[in-house]
Amino acid sequence: MVQRGSKVRILRPESYWFQDVGTVASVDQSGIKYPVIVRFDKVNYAGINTNNFAVDELIEVEAPKAKAKK
């Protein structure tokens, strides 16, 4: 399950970040076509480091780390 904080691999071939790993910044639940915003370490040609993807264009590589209890 892709959720905020997950590390994901990109499967969209036309994407600048194809086969790269990024971190999920947010997941929109409203029913839009590309609900997952992914943030990357490197920027593309336009200087952008985030992009929206569909859930089926992503593979979760690592689950988010659990928050430490106080």
Curated annotation (Swiss-Prot):
Q: Which domain of life is it from?
A: Bacteria
Keywords for this entry?
A: Membrane, Photosynthesis, Photosystem I, Thylakoid
A GO biological process held by the record? photosynthesis
Q: Does the keyword Thylakoid apply?
A: yes
Family, as annotated: Belongs to the PsaE family.
Subunit composition and interactions: The cyanobacterial PSI reaction center is composed of one copy each of PsaA,B,C,D,E,F,I,J,K,L,M and X, and forms dimeric and tetrameric complexes.
Please report the name of this protein according to its UniProt entry.
Answer: Photosystem I reaction center subunit IV
